[in-house]
Amino acid sequence: MYDYEDLNWYDYYLVRGFAVVECGGLGTKGSDGFETCGTDLEIDAFKCVIEWLHGDRVAYTDKTSNVAISADWSSGKVGMTGRSYAGTTQFGLATTGVAGLEPIVPVAGIASWYEYTNSQGISTNSLVNYSERLGWYCNGRYLDPDDYATIAEKYGNYMYQ
């Protein structure tokens, strides 16, 4: 029996018949690629997951075996919720018009990168390379020293190109 006064988000949705899926963004710990916080590359990666859940994209069990896996357990209707990074990505995904994305419930997030970094047209951040610094901040791959050692130079070159 659930105490509805003390549910976490997952339990809230699970007891109502929803499946809960978590996926890491590009460059976050345990994933591939480089963190590019808020860019079209990052939004497209999450869009691919929604397309898979909707039945419009093929996914594979791993990078080498070429064994396809379907989300046959999914109704194809995808909702999103979250705060901060997880809230921000929802706004970006909603602008793509991806089929299957139904409600978004961003508890907190950046809806406008321009407004987030500017006030009345003037930058509110003294850091010249703010987007690069934000990318470094959101990048979780540096938490795994063995993994980060394999990408450090390329990631640095990518961020400051």
What kind of feature is each model-predicted range?
Residues M1, V20, W52:
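Serine-hydrolase catalytic-loop signature spanning alpha/beta hydrolases and amidase-signature enzymes
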Residues M1-D6, T28-I43:
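Accessory recognition modules or surfaces
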Residues D3-L7, V15, I43, T61-K63, ...:
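Accessory cap/linker subdomain of secreted extracellular hydrolases
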Residues Y12-R16, A71-S74, G97-V98:
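Extracellular/periplasmic catalytic domains that process cell-envelope and extracellular macromolecules
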Residues L14-G30:
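Conserved alpha/beta-hydrolase
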Residues V20, V78-G82, A86, Q90-A94:
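Conserved catalytic-core segments centered on acid/base and nucleophilic motifs
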Residues T28-S31, A86-T89, A111-Y116:
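Flexible loop/turn segments at secondary-structure boundaries
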Residues T36-L41, C48-S84:
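Gly/Ser-rich "nucleophile elbow"/oxyanion-hole loop immediately N-terminal to the catalytic nucleophile
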